[in-house]
Amino acid sequence: MAYKDLLNCKIITAFITPFHEDGSINFGAIPDLIEHLLAHHTDGILLAGTTAESPTLTHDEELELFAAVQKVVKGRVPLIAGVGTNETRDSIEFVKEVDAFGGFAAGLAIVPYYNKPSQEGMYQHFKAIADASNLPIIIYNIPGRVVVEMTPETMLRLAEHPNIIGVKECTSLANMAYLIEHRPEEFLIYTGEDGDAFHAMNLGADGVISVASHTNGDEMFEMLDAIEHNDIKKAAAIQRKFIPKVNALFSYPSPAPVKAVLNYLGFAAGPTRLPLVPAPEEDAKRIIKVVVDGDYQATKETVKGVLRPDY
């Protein structure tokens, strides 16, 4: 059922956590943010992921966040819960708690960071999480943040587990192509990099788990819709204008730039929690000009070349 629930989700937004200036969660800001996303082509929502600043959230805060979002969404789109840490026992206990909490199509579990496990260690970690509950698991492979990379061979080995239903892949397009070619049936493959969405979807990926959809969901939708209708020239033209905006959104550690843009647009995204800090004021102004207005001069002043965001 979870696979079918997520199959038509092309744009899954990795939701920010809005904070007050004192660092507490701003639950009052959630309804407007959610309605904004749903009005601009978000098909699903990931909670308590990297963009949500999950390393700074307690499990109790995450559960409060889950309840608040579920109350607003009311089943209109599938929800995914961030459930993984770098400690297997903690991940097992939390995935059981989230499964009992209910209301989620799947849980997202990150490759363990800091401990630097081997491929066999990664396999055993995810197998233990997937065995622990009935909540379907999506693996999050993001070597830019966790230092180690799960190989396609290990990923495909885990893809045979009946309770592991997909991956958020942030490695290379070559790896993505291999996974798409060799995956079993009913295994979802998402790119986790906004800038790669054009290429990933043309390779046959199922969708994108996105940060840029907070601010540029319409452009993302138009590009993916053009790909679906085999209008590659139109999709490529959108991609060329979209890339500078993605670069701007990752010119400082995420989610600082997207929060700056959301605050400018009138959504109370608030600050980041330490150790993340907001983008400097002048740079934030340039980021806003790029993301909101497509300002080419601001693009040149804000970012150089093409960034590969490790989010």
UniProtKB/Swiss-Prot annotation:
Keywords: Amino-acid biosynthesis, Cytoplasm, Diaminopimelate biosynthesis, Lyase, Lysine biosynthesis, Schiff base. It comes from the Bacteria. GO terms for molecular function: 4-hydroxy-tetrahydrodipicolinate synthase activity. Pathway: Amino-acid biosynthesis; L-lysine biosynthesis via DAP pathway; (S)-tetrahydrodipicolinate from L-aspartate: step 3/4. Pfam families: DHDPS. One of its GO terms (cellular component) is cytosol. The active site is at residues 140, 168. CDD domains: DHDPS. Its EC number is 4.3.3.7. The record marks 50, 114 as: Part of a proton relay during catalysis. Pyruvate binds at residues 51, 209. SUPFAM superfamilies: Aldolase. InterPro entries: Aldolase_TIM, DapA, DapA-like, Schiff_base-form_aldolases_AS. GO terms for biological process: diaminopimelate biosynthetic process; lysine biosynthetic process via diaminopimelate. It catalyses: L-aspartate 4-semialdehyde + pyruvate = (2S,4S)-4-hydroxy-2,3,4,5-tetrahydrodipicolinate + H2O + H(+). Disulfide bonds: none annotated. The keyword Cytoplasm applies. Signal peptide: none annotated. Its main location: cytoplasm. It is found in: Cytoplasm. Catalyzes the condensation of (S)-aspartate-beta-semialdehyde [(S)-ASA] and pyruvate to 4-hydroxy-tetrahydrodipicolinate (HTPA). Belongs to the DapA family. Homotetramer; dimer of dimers. HAMAP family: DapA. This is 4-hydroxy-tetrahydrodipicolinate synthase. It comes from Streptococcus gordonii (strain Challis / ATCC 35105 / BCRC 15272 / CH1 / DL1 / V288). The lineage of its organism: Bacteria, Bacillati, Bacillota, Bacilli, Lactobacillales. The gene is dapA.
